[in-house]
């Protein structure tokens, strides 16, 4: 049996109602054809000229906007008054008659215009009536029951266990048994293969507080029963068949409870319970694994096994008359290839926006009230207008700018480029250059045409008197740093300078800081004392001792007479510090091969054999070798003592002798002639030579570090000085001490 076409009650009234609306429709502003309104003067076309109101809506133009207060960007210049059942800015929205799923056992189609309700139910096999609510006698009466307590389902929090888990004895309801008939097709849905999705909350799809749900959707061919095979951990408690809206909202308000049949290992939904198209079920399962009552949301899409041949698509009811039904031999289902602008599994939805008729990125709104290709509305972006938003709005067409301003139109409105001297959104106000008090710091503003000038207060400058005069720019401080202070300046003088401009230098010498007749020399921030030679110090307060830094050695003394100290060396030393011992042997004072031994402030000569004297200048004649040998072998210090003693005795005797001789000679000289004088002279000469010899002997005895010696005196022949050829000293020989 083919699906029947059910006509909704009152469908035949639709043409009459449409005609009545056309005949009774009022003209603009309440005018009618019998009383035409006098023709208005020709002007620019209004916003209602494009007939933007759809579905019999009445367009009313808004008052012309004030140029000073233009309408908000994007707001149209008209409003639509929609008839009953129609809504939207352009009366483009019509309530979907199929949204409430009026067809209980069939598919709802809004394509027919012969129904006053705006929809047509295509009943499934076994059902009839305007809403497919009447079951044929072949439907088992035990398959449906009334909804006992329709209620809004509430999610179970994930952290909270249900108040009571029904035991299996109470959860399992005694159901009529079912046995498959010969050739009957059954599709099994295994419960353990259905995954629990935690984010699916029954009652609130965005909630995360539910214990989870099971969402299943699959297709089955027509005339096929569905067997829900349960496992050992879950048992089905309740099952409702709901509308599409109730399925989305997890609501049982418009649902009916379903009593499936009991089969081996599961529950069975008979094919008579599954209408052609979408079938939505909500069930509750007592799950012992999750220890909660899990919601099962089941969608079964039933399709006919084969396509119904027809002369045109209008008779192809499987695809709502707006598509081509196709099937494959390997599949038990069919699919619809929809015509242009039709969408949905059964091509049941008309989408006028599918071909994107709106231009300039406008939004297309599908009205869904008729299928003539014009049931859409374009919502234009700011700056565009027209049925398809194809025209750009010229906001400058009414010349809103005044006083010769230039109007610039943009997508969001217009802007006015004002000439000099005017301002405002439409350049309607004249500029007062001094109105904004541009002169700062108590400056006085004067209007100069469209400009202004400022007379600045003392200390300020600039076009708006905003700048302090920089008094320091001219560097008024001669020897200091300039600092601006308010409307003046101040000089911070460098050390050593004073005055208003730091032009005067301090004379530090006025206080006479230098002592001891020193000269004071004035400096910048200071002074310098030039001391006399014998003074030193910052103020020449210290006496400079010439000997303070002089080091005199070896018993020398420092002479501080003068500016520089001088060392006066002890005998035998030389040098600036008397640190050099004079080597008297450098002049080779020892004669006849004598060896010179340097001594402090002197020297000693070690004479060779046969020579004596300080410088080994006296030659000795020895009487015998024994005496010489004894002198040679005698210790030198003993010899020196003996010789010294002999010499002293000899000298005393010699002095006495000489004195006596000289006295005698003087007496004789006084009474004698010249020869006597010459003789006396020769005597003095002899006495002088002899005295030198004795002195040399004494020097050898009493010289520096000389060794003691004793001498025996013997006569020595002095032929030149002795008149009687008799030697005065015959022999000088050493004695052992």
Curated annotation (Swiss-Prot):
It is a single-pass type I membrane protein. GO terms for molecular function: calcium ion binding; clathrin binding; Notch binding; transmembrane signaling receptor activity. Expressed in brain, spinal cord and adrenal gland. InterPro entries: DNER_C, EGF-like_Ca-bd_dom, EGF-like_CS, EGF-like_dom, EGF-type_Asp/Asn_hydroxyl_site, EGF_Ca-bd_CS, Growth_fac_rcpt_cys_sf, Notch_Cell-Fate_Det. This is Delta and Notch-like epidermal growth factor-related receptor. It comes from Homo sapiens (Human). Residues 44-133 are annotated as: Interaction with NOTCH1. The modification Phosphotyrosine is found at residues 711, 721. GO terms for cellular component: dendrite; early endosome; neuronal cell body; plasma membrane. Activator of the NOTCH1 pathway. May mediate neuron-glia interaction during astrocytogenesis. Keywords: Activator, Calcium, Cell membrane, Disulfide bond, EGF-like domain, Glycoprotein, Membrane, Notch signaling pathway, Phosphoprotein, Receptor, Repeat, Signal, Transmembrane, Transmembrane helix. GO terms for biological process: central nervous system development; endocytosis; glial cell differentiation; neuron migration; Notch receptor processing; Notch signaling pathway; skeletal muscle fiber development; synapse assembly. The modification Phosphoserine is found at residues 685, 722.
